[in-house]
Amino acid sequence: MSNQLNTMDIKEILKYLPHRYPFLLIDRVLDFTRGESLHAIKNVTINEPFFQGHFPVQPVMPGVLILEAMAQATGLLAFKTMSEEPSPNVLYYFAGIDKARFKRVVGPGDQIHFHVKMIKERRGIGVFIGEAYVDGELACSAEIMCARREISK
C-alpha cells in the first residue's frame, strides 16, 4: 500500500484490477478523492509490445489502448468510491464510451497523466469524464461508463 492514503502504488493497483501484462496500463495513482476524481499515470516505453507493429518506423500508442488505460483508471475510482475491498468476485467492466477525441500522438518516452472525474452513479453503473495529458497537452478525452458486476463461480 502507498504511504499516503490517497495514492496507490502498483501493488495496490494489482489488488483491484484483474489486468496483467501486457494489458495492465496504469503504473501509479498519484491522487484520488472518493466519489470525485482520480489522477493516474502510465509510463510509455519503447518496450511496449504494441510498438512492434504500431508502427515500427514511427511508434504510436494505439488510441484504443489510451482509452483502455482511461477505463482502468475509472475502474479504480469506482472501487474506491464504493469503498469496496478488492475481490475476485467483483469487477467493474468497461461498459461504454462516448465523445472520444484524440488530440495528440503518444509515443515512447511519454508519460500519460489520466484525470478521471465521476459524473454520476446509479444502480452500479458509473459515468465518468476522462482526459489524458502528455507534457501538459491534452492527448485524449472521452466520457466513459463502467458497470459493477458480481462474478459467479
From Swiss-Prot:
Report a single Gene Ontology molecular function: (3R)-hydroxyacyl-[acyl-carrier-protein] dehydratase activity
Q: Where is the active site?
A: H54
The Gene Ontology biological process annotation of the record reads:
fatty acid biosynthetic process; lipid A biosynthetic process
Provide the alphabetized UniProt keywords: Cytoplasm, Lipid A biosynthesis, Lipid biosynthesis, Lipid metabolism, Lyase
User: What Pfam families is this protein classified in?
Assistant: FabA
User: In UniProt terms, what function does this protein have?
Assistant: Involved in unsaturated fatty acids biosynthesis. Catalyzes the dehydration of short chain beta-hydroxyacyl-ACPs and long chain saturated and unsaturated beta-hydroxyacyl-ACPs.
Q: Which family does it belong to?
A: Belongs to the thioester dehydratase family. FabZ subfamily.
Name of the protein in its database record:
3-hydroxyacyl-[acyl-carrier-protein] dehydratase FabZ
* Gene from which this protein is expressed: fabZ
